[in-house]
A protein has these predicted regions:
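ABC family nucleotide-binding domain
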Residues: 2-211
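Conserved beta-strand-loop-alpha-helix hinge in the C-terminal portion
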Residues: 215-233
Length: 233
């Protein structure tokens, strides 16, 4: 069942007489519980696509439907509610609050989500229950990224959006993070969408969307995606 549907979506930026089509007439759909990779070079439109799906921006043309709701028609307040209730975000840089402990960083989302899950349970799920009272500066990069994933999951989102989640990590830690994200799709029914320029990560995906110059070049379904351990780094 499709949880996400883009129909003829464009995002156009203007400056004087100049017009930039960051996305140009994009259409695709995604089923619930899939591990999706959006692949393309820098400037292809990947992050614009992710921002639109995450409710951080609105399309200039077309419609974006998530769980039956056309989010392209939502007001600013309604988009804020959508971001709080439906999507979780994981970025390349972890955006943890340095003066809060691990537990406090994760628990923080319970203040904006009415259906938040237990913070300790999410921290345990990412394997860092022993670090509840540590501050971000006391963690490795991989540990900080896992905490950012725990924080996103604590919101109990339908969709987990990840922008280059392994970009700042070494290969061993990157594999660990990808295993965790893959598990969220396979065993917890989350729709996980990863934006990356790393073609190796695409080998793990149920669906690969290739983007170039603001256009969808292909949407490929992979029947037998590789595990993170099988991908050559």
């Amino acid at each position: 069942m499709a949880i996400v549907k883009f129909e003829n979506v464009s995002r156009i930026y203007t400056s004087g007489d100049h017009e930039l089509r960051a996305l140009d007439n994009v259409s695709f759909s995604l089923d619930e519980g899939k591990f999706v990779v959006i692949l393309g070079p820098s400037g292809a439109g990947k992050s614009t696509l992710l921002n639109l799906l995450g409710g951080l921006d609105s399309p200039s043309e077309g419609t974006i439907t998530v769980s039956g709701t056309d989010i392209s028609k939502l007001t600013d307040n309604e988009l804020a509610d959508y971001r709080a209730s439906t999507v979780g975000f994981v970025f390349q840089f972890y955006n943890l609050i340095p003066t809060l402990t691990v537990y406090e960083n994760v628990r923080l989302v319970s203040e904006i989500s009415g259906k938040a899950l237990d913070a300790k349970e999410m921290i345990d799920r990412v394997g860092l229950l022993d670090h509840l009272n540590n501050f971000p500066s006391e963690l490795s990069g991989g540990e900080q990224q896992r905490i950012s994933i725990a924080r996103a999951l604590c919101k109990n989102p339908q969709i987990l959006l990840c922008d280059e989640p392994t970009g700042a990590l070494d290969s061993e830690t990157g594999v660990m993070v990808l295993k965790l994200l893959f598990d969220m799709a396979r065993n917890y029914g989350k729709t996980v969408v990863i934006v990356t320029h790393n073609q190796n990560i695409a080998k793990m995906a149920d669906v690969v969307i290739r983007v170039k110059n603001g256009k969808i070049r292909s949407v490929e379904e992979q029947e037998n995606p590789l595990s993170a351990d099988e991908v050559e780094w």
